[in-house]
């Protein structure tokens, strides 16, 4: 049976899969309950906590699968070309607080069905690379994986956000094989240079510090810094190309 992510909550209700309550899962449940009590979100909106637990388990499994795939692709590239396009890979599962806030911000009730349908970045992977050309190289390698389905792409490299944010986003689904079913699960992949990642981390902190409404002078300064980062990436790319040309000429001698 192949289950679409849009019918996720229905399939999980029917699934006999249940996780043993480990310390980590108990802490996760406590965070959900604490936040729900604090924000007056009724418990009935989440159905059973066991369902939530199973959903998170499936997203964690999807994250592991995509991470492993990226690691293999990077290793293969090193094996064939003696070069690693990927510098760092980070992954995370969105916290219950963030999921609930995002649903409320977009006017949706806090339910498992809405969570799965409308929150595309519950499972997220961030890939940092040295050069802008690596971004498209990595995106191309990921796109060629037959067991991944590309749902959407957003090229903020060519079309930066107003804030100055630059990155390349891919929304994919990967099949998670359970004992009695296959669940197509969404994972968001962000690819950017190390310099862009440094800038984005600072911008992200400011966004949440000021709840998206920071002082004008800070916003302006960040936008200016984003321009410098873009210029730096361009110069480093050009310098790398010159180094590669020099290396090829040296090999011929």
Regions found by a protein language model. Name each.
Residues 35-76, 188-253:
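An acidic, glycine-/histidine-flanked metal-binding catalytic module
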Residues 84-122:
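A glycine-rich, hydrophobic loop/mini-helix early in the fold
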């Amino acid at each position: 049976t192949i289950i679409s992510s849009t019918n996720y909550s229905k399939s999980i209700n029917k699934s006999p899969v249940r996780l043993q309550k480990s310390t980590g899962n108990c802490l996760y449940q406590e965070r959900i309950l604490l936040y729900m009590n604090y924000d007056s979100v009724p418990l009935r909106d989440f159905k059973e906590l066991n369902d939530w637990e199973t959903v998170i388990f499936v997203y964690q499994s999807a994250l592991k699968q995509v991470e492993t795939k990226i690691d293999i692709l990077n290793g293969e590239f090193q094996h064939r070309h003696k070069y690693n396009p990927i510098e760092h890979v980070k992954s995370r599962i969105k916290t219950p607080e963030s999921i609930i806030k995002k649903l409320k911000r977009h006017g949706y009730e806090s339910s498992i069905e809405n969570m799965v349908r409308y929150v595309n970045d519950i499972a997220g992977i961030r890939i940092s690379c040295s050069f802008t050309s690596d971004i498209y190289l990595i995106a191309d390698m990921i796109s060629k994986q037959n067991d991944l389905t590309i749902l959407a792409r957003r090229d903020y490299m060519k079309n930066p956000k107003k804030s100055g944010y630059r990155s390349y986003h891919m929304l994919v689904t990967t099949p998670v094989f359970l004992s009695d079913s296959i669940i197509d699960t969404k994972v968001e992949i962000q690819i950017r240079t190390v310099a862009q990642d440094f800038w984005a981390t600072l911008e992200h902190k400011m966004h949440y510090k000021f709840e998206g409404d920071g002082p004008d002078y800070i916003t302006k300064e960040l936008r200016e810094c984003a321009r410098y980062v873009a210029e730096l990436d361009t110069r480093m790319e050009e310098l790398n190309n010159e180094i590669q040309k020099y290396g090829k000429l040296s090999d011929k001698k």
